[in-house]
Amino acid sequence: MLLAIDVRNTHTVVGLLSGMKEHAKVVQQWRIRTESEVTADELALTIDGLIGEDSERLTGTAALSTVPSVLHEVRIMLDQYWPSVPHVLIEPGVRTGIPLLVDNPKEVGADRIVNCLAAYDRFRKAAIVVDFGSSICVDVVSAKGEFLGGAIAPGVQVSSDAAAARSAALRRVELARPRSVVGKNTVECMQAGAVFGFAGLVDGLVGRIREDVSGFSVDHDVAIVATGHTAPLLLPELHTVDHYDQHLTLQGLRLVFERNLEVQRGRLKTAR
């Protein structure tokens, strides 16, 4: 059983995966709030409470964090609470198997790397990955499995909350599809701007990528896959996305763990 931990700016996804390679599947998943000042002990108590008896069946752990302070605590937690379980943290120097053809590879978020790795592993062709999180990341993978870069925009919830926070006449609203793109009240107007506006943003970015990037035109076979917590809200309004994979990031973490498994085994033998 593999424990996968995906720490983002606002929420953390904890998953358990059974099996390896093409037989691997997510059997449990939880979503909890990310606390930037959380300690290793607090993390361990939370995760151990979630996974229960499966804690004794762990064969490995893979984790990423877009919050550096939390990544540090995750490392301490794994060393202290599961010292005999091999683990991989996605950070510079870890083998991912995906070339990063960008100006500064160290700047690329671990979440973007594992998403693209998982998309290429699943479809085995050029891909555009759209991750709907606190930011919307639209990333590009070549037909050779190379990370070519991408675009980052503010997330749907973040943008809606910012509009409410900076305007005396607006308030925070539930993210839901309104009756029409033409809202009849303030809540519906904000929902229309969030849902239809960001669907148009994503379709526009994907369309520009297909126009501007060699090998991604409409004449080429390109997988366009969405993931992320708010993706289901926008999927019905998107015209460019072909696939939705709720577990894309967790599967990407598994792939990185498997690619580093031999290295981990070597470290364990040395430790003995």
UniProtKB/Swiss-Prot annotation:
<dbReference type="GO" id="GO:0015937">
    <property type="term" value="P:coenzyme A biosynthetic process"/>
</dbReference>
<dbReference type="GO" id="GO:0005737">
    <property type="term" value="C:cytoplasm"/>
</dbReference>
<dbReference type="GO" id="GO:0046872">
    <property type="term" value="F:metal ion binding"/>
</dbReference>
<keyword id="KW-0963">Cytoplasm</keyword>
<feature type="binding site">
    <location>
        <position position="134"/>
    </location>
    <ligand>
        <name>ATP</name>
    </ligand>
</feature>
<keyword id="KW-0479">Metal-binding</keyword>
<dbReference type="GO" id="GO:0005886">
    <property type="term" value="C:plasma membrane"/>
</dbReference>
<keyword id="KW-0630">Potassium</keyword>
<feature type="binding site">
    <location>
        <position position="131"/>
    </location>
    <ligand>
        <name>K(+)</name>
    </ligand>
</feature>
<keyword id="KW-0173">Coenzyme A biosynthesis</keyword>
<comment type="function">
    <text>Catalyzes the phosphorylation of pantothenate (Pan), the first step in CoA biosynthesis.</text>
</comment>
<feature type="binding site">
    <location>
        <begin position="109"/>
        <end position="112"/>
    </location>
    <ligand>
        <name>substrate</name>
    </ligand>
</feature>
<keyword id="KW-0067">ATP-binding</keyword>
<comment type="subunit">
    <text>Homodimer.</text>
</comment>
<feature type="binding site">
    <location>
        <position position="186"/>
    </location>
    <ligand>
        <name>substrate</name>
    </ligand>
</feature>
<dbReference type="GO" id="GO:0016301">
    <property type="term" value="F:kinase activity"/>
</dbReference>
<comment type="pathway">
    <text>Cofactor biosynthesis; coenzyme A biosynthesis; CoA from (R)-pantothenate: step 1/5.</text>
</comment>
<keyword id="KW-0547">Nucleotide-binding</keyword>
<protein>
    <recommendedName>
        <fullName>Type III pantothenate kinase</fullName>
        <ecNumber>2.7.1.33</ecNumber>
    </recommendedName>
</protein>
<comment type="similarity">
    <text>Belongs to the type III pantothenate kinase family.</text>
</comment>
<feature type="active site" description="Proton acceptor">
    <location>
        <position position="111"/>
    </location>
</feature>
<feature type="binding site">
    <location>
        <begin position="6"/>
        <end position="13"/>
    </location>
    <ligand>
        <name>ATP</name>
    </ligand>
</feature>
<dbReference type="InterPro" id="IPR043129">
    <property type="entry name" value="ATPase_NBD"/>
</dbReference>
<dbReference type="Pfam" id="PF03309">
    <property type="entry name" value="Pan_kinase"/>
</dbReference>
<keyword id="KW-0808">Transferase</keyword>
<dbReference type="GO" id="GO:0005524">
    <property type="term" value="F:ATP binding"/>
</dbReference>
<keyword id="KW-0418">Kinase</keyword>
<dbReference type="InterPro" id="IPR004619">
    <property type="entry name" value="Type_III_PanK"/>
</dbReference>
